[in-house]
Every structure is written in structure tokens, then in C-alpha cells.
Amino acid sequence: MQDATRLVIFLHGVGSSGADLLPLAGPLRHALPGTAFAAPDAPFPFPYGMGHQWFSIAGVTEDNRAGRIKAARADFDRVIGEIIETHVFADKLDRVAFVGFSQGTIMALDALASGRWPVGAIVAFSGRLASPYPLSPGKATPVLLVHGAADSVIPAAETVKATAILQGLGVDVESRILPGVDHTISAEGIELVGEFLAGRLSN
């Protein structure tokens, strides 16, 4: 999009692709006029299907997950850096938002928690904060965490936990647990994205 004033980057989950999330841009265009949307594929193929992954989940445990996230940072940064360069937002990170789902949320929150990407806002669906310590998040980035109460893949307790940790580190965090919602981005969730980014992302 030429002359976009904001950039939203969708980050998909395991076994998915950017093309699966890009349609979410449709209902967000009214709330976020003048916004460009991008939805990259994660850099690694998912071995059990046709999609992609940010890091391997084969044999992943609570003990080794943080190490895998750390190892995935360079490739994540390359993918994000290319998008930001393409859209000419390198000097306008305060106008960039990450919207993650599941593993995409893990990587979005890691980008914040490590202090690597001081973007304008982050919306994180159905994921967890699993970054290696110590955490050094940029405190200027507001965060919205959204999780389905009926999530059968990653329990909503992970969002409750992430909220407490990030707030304890001085991050501006809002969280919403949506009753009856499983591991998905619901219509209500999309409305929350539009409202949050319209109010918090620089234009």
C-alpha cells in the first residue's frame, strides 16, 4: 500500500501460513484506515503438513522451549526486517504493530520481552510468554493479550501469567479472556484488535 501511515504484521501459528491470517485485514481496514498489512510465512517448514513454523515443536518441553525461541530470533528478525524495509517503516517503528497467534504470539512477545523490536503495539492471541530470562521489555509498547477461555491447545492461564509478568516489568498490558472460545481468533477478538490499535498505534 502506497503512503501507508501504519503497518500491521500478522504472525501465524505452527503449521499455518501468512495467507491464513491475511484475510483478517479485511475487517480491520475500517478501524485502521491508511494501514498496510503484511503476513509473512515463518521461515521453517512444518514437517507434519503443508504449513510453516517459527521453531520446531518436535519434543518441545518447558525446559527446552526458551532455548528454541532464542535460536529462532535471528530468522524472525530477518523476516520482520525485510517487511519493514519493504514498507519503508524502519524509522517509524512506533507505527508498526505485531498481531500474533499461538506460536506467532510467542515470537511477538519475545520480540518485546527481549527489547529487540520497540514497535508501536502488540496484540497477542492464544499464546504464552516463554522467552529466556532475563527479560528486558521496552516499556513504551502497549500490549493486548487475548485468549479463549476454552482453549484446548494453550490454556488461558498462560495469558493470565504473561499479563502478571509483563505488568510487573512495567509494560502497559491489557488482557481479555473470552468465554467459550477455543484456540482461534474469534470475531469478537478481531473487534478488540481494531479498537486497541486504533487507540494505541501512532498514525
Give the positions of each predicted feature.
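Conserved alpha/beta-hydrolase "nucleophile elbow" surrounding the catalytic nucleophile
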Residues: H12-V14, V96-F101, G148
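Short beta-strand/loop motif that positions the catalytic acidic residue
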Residues: L145-H147, D151
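Primarily recognizes the serine-hydrolase "nucleophile elbow" in alpha/beta-hydrolase
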Residues: L93-A140
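Serine-hydrolase catalytic machinery in alpha/beta-hydrolase-like enzymes
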Residues: M1-D94
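C-terminal catalytic histidine-bearing segment of alpha/beta-hydrolase fold enzymes
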Residues: A157-N203
